[in-house]
A protein has these predicted regions:
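Non-heme Fe(II) oxygenase catalytic core, chiefly the N-lobe of the double-stranded beta-helix
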Residues: 1-227
């Protein structure tokens, strides 16, 4: 079992946030260029803890947000949602009590319908409600590791279809993005994926985009996905 508790960091402070995942990072200002040494430790903390929280930051300008994101790799642009003017990599979310929809109402892995899904997502919060509106996270390493060895072996040989048309069609019409302007990608991914850097295995299915396990009948697929 992977245990990140003994990791030592020299340029940042890392405080474990919860037993199963997440850590709070202090000692770094994301509104400025992050040093190579600090970034290396942030990347290591990301691999160790999966979700990182940077509290009480100065506002991060869009260009700095994009610059920091590019340190992790090529940035993804959302195939359907309207993006920030001048920054196609940034997807702005506005929701109030009167909004017809709120992004991410159900458990999902962001844009898993893409052929090459994003490594992760960077959120910068500007206006928060006094209560509610929580963003929740789940550790899919632990989800896999909690399964019996027989079920792990069974799932390891399967693939799943991830689709987006049922999610994206009509979703952004009230924000000036017509269906004719969007892409609705579809992809097939292994049900169990191995992280290329940590070597850990994780479940890679979700309620929002995963529509079928391909090697099973429709009824068998439904039963497994609803477990």
């Amino acid at each position: 079992m992977f245990d990140p508790t003994n990791s030592d960091y020299k340029t940042i402070s890392v405080k474990r946030f919860a037993p199963n995942l997440g850590a709070e990072i202090t000692g770094v200002d994301l509104s400025k260029r992050v040093s190579n040494d600090q970034f290396a430790e942030i990347k290591r903390a990301f691999l160790d803890h999966q979700v990182l929280f940077f509290k009480d930051q100065n506002e991060v300008a869009p260009e700095m947000h994009v610059m920091f994101g590019k340190r992790f790799g090529v940035l993804h642009s959302h195939p359907a949602a309207p993006t920030m003017k001048g920054y196609p990599e940034i997807f702005e979310i506005h929701a109030t009590r009167d909004s017809k929809i709120a992004n991410g109402e159900f458990w999902h892995s962001d844009v898993s319908c893409d052929q090459t899904p994003p490594l992760g997502t960077m959120l910068q919060l500007h206006i928060l409600p006094s209560c509610g509106g929580d963003t929740m996270f789940s550790n899919m390493y632990s989800a896999f590791e909690s399964l019996s060895e027989r079920l792990q072996a069974f799932l390891s040989g399967l693939t799943a279809t991830h689709e987006s048309e049922h999610i994206y069609r009509g979703r952004y019409n009230d924000r000036g993005k017509n269906d004719s302007e969007i892409d609705c990608p579809r992809a097939v991914h292994p049900v169990i994926r191995t992280h290329p850097e940590t070597g850990r295995r994780a479940l890679f299915v979700n309620r929002t985009f995963t529509t079928k396990i391909n090697e099973l009948s429709s009824e068998e697929s439904r039963c497994v996905l609803e477990m």
